[in-house]
Amino acid sequence: MKRNVLLLPLLIFLLIAAALLWQLARNAQGDDPTNLESALTGKPVPAFRLESLETPGQYYQAEVLTQGKPVLLNVWATWCPTCRAEHQYLNQLSAQGIRVVGLNYKDDRAKAVAWLKELGNPYALSLSDSDGMLGLDLGVYGAPETFLIDGRGIIRYRHAGDLNARVWESELKPLWDRYSREAAQ
């Protein structure tokens, strides 16, 4: 009996190690744990009425995302360290003419406005989702997340995690180019 009790920690360790190795093998075969499928892919952006982050009292609806050209909807917050890491790249994309709309998620308005002044504002428009309701409707797990929305307001892609050059070039840019061409026709 004592021998079995002594082997229990070893058995638990081996089970944890096996689970870890199994997940690492899946990742090596291309199973990306950050690739979270969205139930909204292929569907219109949910209806919303949100206040401008920078202009209190000015409200926008989903139509602001359906202006005939694709747009990136970037979910961010000042409490999110990864959002800070991706922010410089968003500034670069914006400078290249990529239209990015910011969705400030469950955040303090004054802190968010100060953050944009300090780090630069890549957003053509900043929306305040202080209660997180649009985030909930979009199925947001946390910040940052980025949605590619085509010119008709259809969600075409969702990326959970920071948007960086690798993600842009391999995942989003091909789709951006495709939907930009479609919008130009």
Curated annotation (Swiss-Prot):
Residues 1-4 are cytoplasmic. The lineage of its organism: Bacteria, Pseudomonadati, Pseudomonadota, Gammaproteobacteria, Enterobacterales. Residues 39-177 form the Thioredoxin domain. It comes from the Bacteria. Gene3D superfamilies: Glutaredoxin. One of its GO terms (cellular component) is plasma membrane. The gene is dsbE1. One of its GO terms (molecular function) is disulfide oxidoreductase activity. The keyword Transmembrane applies. Keywords: Cell inner membrane, Cell membrane, Cytochrome c-type biogenesis, Disulfide bond, Membrane, Redox-active center, Transmembrane, Transmembrane helix. This is Thiol:disulfide interchange protein DsbE. It is found in: Cell inner membrane. It comes from Salmonella typhimurium (strain LT2 / SGSC1412 / ATCC 700720).
